[in-house]
Swiss-Prot record:
Domain annotation MCM: ranges: 533-621
Residues modified to Phosphoserine: 292
Function in brief: Plays an important role in meiotic recombination and associated DNA double-strand break repair.
Keywords linked to the UniProt accession: DNA damage, DNA repair, Meiosis, Phosphoprotein
Gene Ontology terms: biological process: double-strand break repair involved in meiotic recombination; double-strand break repair via break-induced replication; late meiotic recombination nodule assembly; oogenesis; spermatogenesis; synaptonemal complex assembly
The protein, known as: Minichromosome maintenance domain-containing protein 2
Superkingdom of origin organism: Eukaryota
GO molecular function: ATP binding; DNA binding
Any one cellular-component term (Gene Ontology): nucleus
InterPro entries: MCM, MCM_lid, P-loop_NTPase
Stored Pfam families: MCM_lid
Protein's UniProt keywords contain DNA repair: yes
Length: 681
């Protein structure tokens, strides 16, 4: 096909797609402007499928020779401007800068760039699609979008006019646009830039890793090798600030090689789309059957879930309280692009750190964004110099931002330094982290600061044996209060749930754990319990993925009970000297716990039975922090019996019903102005 035919096809596409009208509107803006322009920039939205259907050769040019395709549209647009007299000041075709923005690429393997596979096909300068998570980003800097050059010889006719226009093209460096060694084609004299016509644009550099590479941050290995490498993405103009650290995106762009200390493969982004993970349509048949069998009770299903959860790590029936809290925290994670505020942070007091570490590490692998923080790395963002020499500061994500919408497991609190623990406390209280950028250090005139939302739940544990060795045990004057002298009291308060899992607690049966450990040592891959074979890890992954996407709302009874318990607890835990021990976030945390229990039951409505579990868990945590009060809750209130069969589940339901009556009485006594309705009313 001749070049003329392709231009004709381009014009037809612009007319049919509405691009021609948008082009005319943009021209009107330039024509009405009082400013003089050397370069007129136009953005054209291209749907490759529509173009290929209209004209195969033009479509092929767009997909595989995008720079030549841009020249075709440039010629068409120049003819349109001259024919319709759209811009009076326009003199030459080179003044028109066409940017083709693609809506998508064909879903074929040859158009994908997998960062975990080698080698990468980056030699052909055409469009590819890649998917990844942002792990670093720079501040915004300027680049030269376009410039006007004139011949230095005043006698040369090209010392005037707009014959020498240079614009940025994908993959080009700054020196390709602005240099001092350009020569005149007519007289071979050097060209000089007319600086008053230089056009600047915004530029930002981000680094992404493939989603599969998150396995390196999850503390789990299936002995399958994979390639781990970050890829640098250049964002320009309207693409700037469209990517956030921790989010996952699909990126269409053109690969290029940039030479720093070594040659690096980079991508010039053309279009960016946020990735929303697919919501599973349901749960496994085994869980569906279990849900049906326990439908008569609001408590049985979650009790059985906690009982059989992580049977590969710890035998069924052990650590039920902790496992229920872990499941509730997992079900509050999200894969959506929304602010995650309903985080459930968990701090565990234990003497068996190895088993707790394994249990938590197993749990974070059940959600897409479960991150195991390594002590050698940073929890929160850090600053470094940009390796591409653009003068921008590079902000590295850290484990917390990488765990966006998920869980950040930070290990033993005692392994972190004092300043990091203070930073953690601030983040737990504010749910944000502010990064200060000293201008003097990074070559800027002024200091800057950037604030990032921290949208993940934090899990950690404290070794009580370590605490007793380093600090003398303090004598607790309050019943039920736990010795947490190793860590600052304010940090303990910042964690929503404090769970006791030491040898003196009812959730630490000794003999079954020893037997399980010995069996695992003999047969690491063995499944020793019927629950492990009937309810697999994949079943739990599917259950959590389905449950966390449920939209839940409070019933009137549940809402009143939540507010009533909060007011009553705040009243009895208020001292004359230090005021209330309940923080302002306590009510919010009770709401999150209630929602989590409802989601785990696969319900869309929060009932007062969910609020009871939330209140018992929260009161147990408060007792460990501050000691018992009038509403005295046993340490094993949520799991008063070992769950062996249906009879024990029925006994637990009766016990929890009594607890609910006690809670209602407590609210009626200490929560004035709060009405609690009985089922009859």
């Amino acid at each position: 096909m001749s070049n003329l035919k392709m231009k004709e096809a381009a014009l037809i596409y612009l007319d049919r797609s509405g691009g021609l009208q948008k082009f005319i509107d943009d021209c009107k803006y330039y024509n009405d402007s009082k400013q003089s322009y050397a370069v007129y920039r136009f953005k054209i939205l291209i749907n490759p499928s529509d173009v290929v259907e209209l004209d195969a050769e033009l479509g092929n040019h767009i997909l595989h020779q995008p720079l030549k395709a841009a020249e075709v549209f440039q010629s068409v647009c120049f003819i349109a401007v001259k024919t319709l007299s759209l811009i009076g000041q326009l003199q030459t075709e080179t003044q028109i800068n066409i940017v083709l923005k693609l809506t998508h690429l064909p879903p074929l393997p040859s158009y994908g760039l997998d960062l975990c596979e080698f080698p990468l096909d980056y030699t052909s300068q055409r469009f590819y699609m890649m998917q990844g998570i942002v792990i670093a980003m720079t501040t915004i800097t300027k680049y030269t979008q376009g410039a006007r050059f004139l011949c230095s010889d005043e006698a040369c006719p090209l010392s005037k006019g707009f014959q020498y226009i240079r614009v940025h093209v994908p993959g080009a460096t700054e020196s390709a646009t602005i240099r001092n060694d350009f020569l005149c084609n007519l007289c071979a004299s050097s060209l000089q830039e007319d600086r008053k016509f230089r056009v600047l644009g915004d530029k930002q550099i981000v680094e992404i890793i493939a989603t599969k590479a998150l396995r390196a941050f999850q503390g789990y290995s299936n002995n399958q090798p994979f390639r781990f490498q970050s890829l640098t993405i250049f964002l320009r103009d309207e693409s700037v600030n469209k990517m956030n650290i921790g989010n996952e995106y699909k990126i269409i762009g053109i690969p290029t090689c940039v030479k720093t200390s070594q040659t690096a493969v980079c991508i010039e982004a053309n279009s960016i789309t946020f990735c929303n993970s697919k919501v599973p349509s349901g749960i496994s048949d085994n869980f569906r059957c279990l849900l049906s069998l326990t439908s008569s009770s609001c408590w049985k299903f979650t009790a059985i879930l906690a009982n059989i959860f992580a049977s590969q790590i710890t035998p069924p029936g052990t650590y039920n309280l902790l496992k229920l809290c872990l499941l509730m925290s997992l079900v509050q994670t999200t894969d959506r692009n929304k602010e995650l505020e309903d985080c459930l942070d968990i701090l565990i007091i234990t003497s068996d750190t190895l088993l707790i570490d394994r249990l938590l590490n197993f749990s974070i692998n059940l959600v897409p964004r479960g991150i195991r923080h390594l002590v050698s790395t940073e929890i929160f963002p850090t600053l470094s110099r940009n390796k591409y020499g653009t003068g921008a500061v590079s902000i590295q994500a850290g484990s917390a931002l990488l765990a966006k919408g998920g869980i950040c497991f930070i290990g033993d609190l005692a392994s972190h330094k004092k300043d990091k623990l203070e930073q953690l406390q601030t983040v737990l209280e504010s749910r944000s982290i502010t990064v200060y950028i000293p201008g003097k250090k990074f070559g800027e005139d002024i200091d800057q600061q950037m604030t990032f939302p921290v949208q993940c739940s934090f899990w950690s544990f404290v070794d009580v044996d370590s605490s007793s060795r380093r600090n003398a045990q303090k004598i607790n004057t309050l019943i039920g209060q736990m010795d947490c002298s190793l860590i600052p009291a304010n940090l303990v308060e910042a964690f929503g749930l404090l769970i006791n899992c030491n040898e003196s607690s009812p959730c630490h049966p000794f003999l079954p754990t020893v037997q399980h450990t010995l069996n695992k040592a003999i047969n690491p891959e063995g499944l020793f319990y019927a629950a492990s074979r009937q309810f697999t890890t994949e079943d739990f992954e599917k259950l959590l993925a389905f449950a966390k996407n449920l939209n839940v709302e409070f019933s009137l009874e549940a809402e009143r009970m939540t507010h009533g318990y909060y007011l009553a607890s705040r009243r009895i835990r208020t001292g004359s000297v230090c005021g209330s021990k309940l923080s302002a976030s306590a009510l919010k945390y009770l709401v999150f716990l209630s929602e989590a229990h409802a989601r785990l039951n696969l319900r869309n409505k929060v009932l007062k039975e969910d609020v009871l579990i939330a209140a018992l868990l929260f009161e147990t945590s408060l007792t460990l922090k501050y000691g018992a009060t009038v509403f005295c809750v046993a340490p094993n209130a949520v799991f008063p019996f070992e769950l062996y069969n249906e009879e024990y589940l029925e006994q637990r339901d009766l016990y929890l019903t009594q607890c609910q009556q006690q809670l209602e009485q407590f609210i009626a006594t200490y929560g004035p102005g709060t009405t609690i309705f009985s089922s009859d009313e």
